[in-house]
Regions:
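Intrinsic disorder in cytosolic terminal tails and internal cytosolic loops
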Residues: 266-282
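Hydrophobic transmembrane-helix bundles of small-molecule transporters
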Residues: 1-81, 88
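12-transmembrane solute porter fold
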Residues: 37-38, 62-232, 242-271
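Short alpha-helical interface patches
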Residues: 11-14, 53, 169, 182, ...
Length: 282
């Protein structure tokens, strides 16, 4: 019927090549040199295949990534905020134990327990947060503001780690991110789903999950590039490790602050307008 079959593996192949073309150069650019023909060629391949993937998906019956949804401005806002809200986790999961062990000098056991209080928070708080968010539409943007703010500020605080810093700072900071994660889990996906037509909810939800996974992959590559830039000369030097870890945390915090700005100046007016329309319709 002149339509591209969604059973074709071509879409998935284009996506894999596009992501590899971008993520691999980000991971190895520091060690191989950013002007290396291999690195530059990888970026070129990534860009070309990204364009090809978008063109292919635009004509697919059931695309892997529904391009048409990006024309929905409200939905796009929530996808971007969700993407940003996941970004800091690449710093938290990898570089908090690294900083605790190699900069502060804590034991492996203490470093391994850093996220234990955070885990407890994320087990119980989402129930309370979800009940609060569901009371009225205005609480949705407040939940997103809490999510971004309580993800950004702990990362910024951890960005000033020194050998004399107490490991208690990491415990407190990561516990606060547990509060952020609890509010993220009950706000991003429901808010995005509310912007979609019933027939688009399934694939729209899948796209949100894809954006979250992509955020983690990009974060790992970018943070690895930053850390390697400081430690490539001497990976065992404490000062180099400290500078690398701190820069990673500050970068994660700065990116999440961008998410907070988006919530305050894009998502908030959008949801307040939507709430006003709901009142008028009633």
């Amino acid at each position: 019927n002149g339509r591209i079959s969604n059973e074709s593996p071509l879409g998935m192949a284009l996506l894999v090549v596009a992501l590899c073309g971008i993520l691999l150069p980000l991971s190895y650019g520091m060690s191989m040199g950013w002007t290396s023909p291999i690195i530059l060629g990888g970026f070129a391949i990534g860009i070309v295949f990204t364009v090809l993937f978008i063109k292919y998906e635009s004509g697919a019956d059931q695309p892997i990534i529904p391009v048409k949804l990006f024309r929905n401005r409200n939905y796009l806002a929530f996808v971007l905020v969700g993407f940003i809200c996941y970004f800091y986790r690449g710093a938290m999961d990898v570089y908090s134990p690294l900083g605790a062990i190699n900069v502060m000098g804590t034991s492996n056991g203490v470093a391994g327990a850093l996220q234990f209080p955070r885990t407890i928070v994320t087990m119980f708080l989402p129930v309370i947060a979800g009940a609060w968010v569901g009371k009225k539409t205005a609480n949705m943007w407040k939940a997103l503001a809490i999510t971004t703010a309580l993800s950004a500020f702990p990362m910024l605080a951890m960005g000033f780690t020194t050998p004399t810093t107490s490991v208690l700072l990491y415990f407190i900071a990561l516990t606060i991110t547990g509060v952020a994660e609890s509010y993220r889990g009950v706000s991003i996906t429901p808010a995005a789903q509310a912007c979609l037509k019933p027939e688009d909810i399934g694939i729209g939800t899948a796209l949100i999950n894809f954006a979250n996974s992509l955020s983690c992959s990009l974060a790992a590559a970018i943070f690895g590039m930053i850390y390697s830039g400081f430690t490539v000369a001497d990976p065992t030097n404490v000062a180099n490790i400290q500078n690398g870890v701190n820069t990673v945390f500050l970068t994660a915090g700065a990116i999440t602050v961008v998410g907070l700005v988006l919530v305050l100046f894009w998502v908030r007016p959008m949801l307040e307008e939507q709430a006003g329309e709901d009142i008028v319709s009633v």
